[in-house]
């Protein structure tokens, strides 16, 4: 019980000291650059209707699909312990084949070409 009391006392003391120091430190004088919001390099006062690249959107959707594929295939080793592991293999192969065919179609249509 003595250890818990010591830890609580140290915690409260350290918190009080840090709070007191934060009030005593001098305030840094703000300038125009520190007061302006920074939003990923874009001018926050400009137009909010910037053109959005459709190719970037398609690449993002493909990334999400293949990320979901990994999440679906991670429990595949545990599927071997079921009563019918061949059914698990058939379903996982079907998912992989469907995603591979979709990727090939997207590639042949030129959806993965960033520059024309």
Curated annotation (Swiss-Prot):
One of its GO terms (cellular component) is mitochondrial membrane. The gene is MT-ND3. This is NADH-ubiquinone oxidoreductase chain 3. It is found in: Mitochondrion membrane. Core subunit of the mitochondrial membrane respiratory chain NADH dehydrogenase (Complex I) that is believed to belong to the minimal assembly required for catalysis. Complex I functions in the transfer of electrons from NADH to the respiratory chain. The immediate electron acceptor for the enzyme is believed to be ubiquinone. It comes from Oncorhynchus gorbuscha (Pink salmon). InterPro entries: NADH_UbQ/plastoQ_OxRdtase_su3, NDAH_ubi_oxred_su3_sf. It is a multi-pass membrane protein. Belongs to the complex I subunit 3 family. The keyword Electron transport applies. It catalyses: a ubiquinone + NADH + 5 H(+)(in) = a ubiquinol + NAD(+) + 4 H(+)(out). The chain crosses the membrane at residues 3-23, 56-76, 87-107. It is an enzyme of class 7 (translocase).
